[in-house]
């Protein structure tokens, strides 16, 4: 569409900024919320149904420290790494699309990308990842701990976990965008 206005030179700028600042981290967080968030809720919830959480308390272990904290730490490390992979895949895919539709060669794409973005653009998206990971882990764990004694309860809480985590991740992404605009980042 930019070709009609003679703005194909800005395709790389737009793709670079949009992918690195917003889309890659947001889509990665949504996928992690759906996959890992639901798994955390299901696992903790099934342990709650089988009274394994109560057994941990009886033997003197803190269920939060044993079950929740390790998952939270793993997500805080994994989501930024997955975001880096997502950034690279998004830019590689964008390069191929720009080449096929606009005739921008991959070498020209990379050259324009270097001119269009700097490290602050890259870090603007990467900074969000640990916060989103904490949200996903906390929401999933809280929903898992709320599970009652039935499979129906487990299913409801797994669904609620994914929906709540995705909603809060999108809200936090919007808050980051407003914060970045306020500090001119």
Describe the role of every protein-language-model region.
Residues 63-83, 161:
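Start (N-cap) of specific transmembrane helices in multi-pass transporter permeases
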Residues 27-28, 33, 40, 80, ...:
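Hydrophobic alpha-helical transmembrane segments of multi-pass membrane proteins
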Residues 43-69, 151-154:
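Short cytoplasmic-facing helical segments at TM-TM junctions of multi-pass membrane proteins
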Residues 154, 162-178:
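Final/C-terminal transmembrane alpha-helix of multipass membrane proteins
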Residues 30, 34-35, 43, 75, ...:
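Hydrophobic positions within alpha-helical transmembrane segments of bacterial inner-membrane proteins
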Residues 59, 128-133, 164, 168-171:
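Hydrophobic membrane-spanning alpha-helices of multi-pass integral membrane proteins
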Residues 1-20, 88-130, 134, 138-160, ...:
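Membrane-interfacial helix-loop-helix connectors in multipass membrane proteins
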Residues 4-48:
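Membrane-embedded translocation segments of transport machinery
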């Amino acid at each position: 569409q930019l070709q009609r206005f003679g703005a194909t030179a800005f395709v790389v700028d737009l793709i670079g900024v949009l992918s690195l600042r917003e889309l890659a981290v947001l889509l990665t967080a949504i996928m992690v919320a759906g996959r890992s968030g639901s798994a955390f809720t299901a696992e903790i919830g099934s342990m709650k149904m089988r009274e394994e959480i109560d057994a941990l308390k009886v033997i003197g272990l803190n269920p939060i420290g044993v079950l929740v904290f390790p998952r939270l730490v793993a997500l805080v490390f994994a989501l930024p790494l997955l975001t880096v992979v997502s950034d690279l895949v998004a830019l590689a895919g964008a390069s191929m699309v720009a080449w096929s539709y606009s005739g921008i060669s991959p070498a020209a794409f990379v050259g324009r990308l270097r001119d269009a973005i700097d490290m602050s653009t890259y870090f603007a998206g990467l900074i969000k990842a640990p916060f989103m990971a904490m949200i996903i882990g906390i929401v999933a764990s809280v929903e898992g701990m709320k599970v009652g004694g039935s499979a129906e309860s487990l299913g409801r809480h797994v669904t609620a976990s994914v929906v709540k985590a995705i909603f809060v991740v999108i809200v936090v992404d919007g808050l980051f965008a407003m914060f970045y605009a306020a500090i001119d980042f």
